[in-house]
Amino acid sequence: MILKASSFKLPKPPLAYSLAACFLGLLAVASLPAQDTPDKNALPRDSQEKIDIDDVTRTYVVHLPPNYDQQQHYPVVILLHGRNQDAGDMARLTHFNQLADKDGIIAVYPNASHGQWNIGVRPEEPSPFAPRRGGGGRRGGWPGGGGGYPGGGGGGGYPGGGQSGGQNPEETKNRPEPPDDVAFLNQMLDQLALKYSLDTRRIYATGLSDGGFMALRVGCSMADRVAAIAAVGAAMPKTMICLPARAVPALFINGTDDPVVPDSGGNYKPGRFHVLSAEDSAKTWSKFDRCGEKPAQGKLPAVDKGGKETKTYTYSGCQDNAQVVLYSVKNAGNTWPGGEQYTSEKEVGKTSNALNANDAIWNFLVTRKIPGESGVQK
C-alpha cells in the first residue's frame, strides 16, 4: 500500500524520551565551536558618504580594509579620478582596493563636481566652463563615450576657473564659480576623522591625469594635512602657483608615449594650458622641497616578462627628509601602469605592465609622515 504524504505521520514518542532528546540536543549545541557574533556597530567596508559645501552635495566612497578595528589607527590614501570619470571608475581601473586590503589602508575615492577637478590653474585660453554663444556643454569622456581620456574629454571642464586674457567679458560675466575642491577635500578629511580611526600623520593623495593634477594641487595647498603625494599621468602646469607650507615628498609616474600630457612638455590635451616636461616637473618640485641639484638616475626592472625597464630620477637631500622621484615608464600612455586599459590606445596610449603603479606608489608613501609629535585621531 502506498501512503499519501498527508496521511503518513510518525508516532509521538513518550514524554520522557522527548525530554532526553531535547537535553542531548542542547549538549550538542553547547559543544559546537563558538561562532562570531555579527557586530551591530561594525561599519560597512564600502560606503558612499555625503557632505554639503556651499549648498552643493559632494560625495566620496570609503573602502575599509578587512577586519577594520576602530581601536587601531589606519593610513589613508585619497585616490583622485580622471576627467569625466568617478570614484567607481578609479577603483576599478587601479585595483587599489586589493593593495588596501592587504596592507591595511583606508582607501578614499572622492567624486569631482561634474567629473572634473578644479586644479587651481588659470586657463591660457577661453575656458569651456564659461557659457558660450550657441550653447555647448561638456562633451565626451570615458566612460560615456566621445573624448575618452581622463585628462580631457575633448571639451568641457574648468582647469582653474580664473578669467584669462582674450575672453569676451559678456561670456564670462555670468560664469558660475568653479567648486572649491581644496575646501571639499579638507571637509572630507574632517568628516572622515569623526567616523573612522585615522592616523592623521599618514594621509596621502594620488590621482590619474586630471586627478594627478589635483594631487599636485593638494601638495601645494594641503601640506598641513597630507604627508606625501603621487601624480600619475600629470605634470606641473606652467601657470600653477604652488607654495607648499613645508617640504612635501612627491612621486611622478609618467609614460614616455603619453598623448594627453606630453612627456616632453607642451600643450595639455584639452588645449587650455601648457605643462612642463616630466623631468622638469620633478625638478621644479625638488626646488619646493629644497633638494639637491641633480637627481640620481637608475632603472627598475620590468615587472612583466619582456617588459621595458623604468627609468628613475631621485632627488634627495631635501628639507625634512623629503624626496622627489620620477618614474619614466617606457611606451606607456596616460594610463595607470598595471591597471586597466580603460579606453582606446589611440586616445590615451598603452597601459604598461612593466611597472605596478600601486606597489610603486605605496612603497614611496608608506614611510612618509607629517612632522610632529602624534597624528593619531582620538
Model regions: which residues?
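Conserved alpha/beta-hydrolase
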Residues: 104-114
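Active-site glycine-rich loops that stabilize anionic/oxyanionic intermediates
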Residues: 82-85, 332
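Short beta-strand/loop motif that positions the catalytic acidic residue
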Residues: 252-254
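Conserved acidic catalytic loop of the alpha/beta-hydrolase fold
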Residues: 183-200
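Active-site-adjacent alpha-helix of alpha/beta-hydrolase-fold enzymes
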Residues: 256-324, 338-355
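Structural cue for short, hydrophobic secondary-structure segments
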Residues: 79-82, 109, 328
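A domain-start/cap signature at the N-terminus of enzymes
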Residues: 32-76, 88-102, 106, 132-142, ...
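Bacterial N-terminal signal peptides
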Residues: 18-28
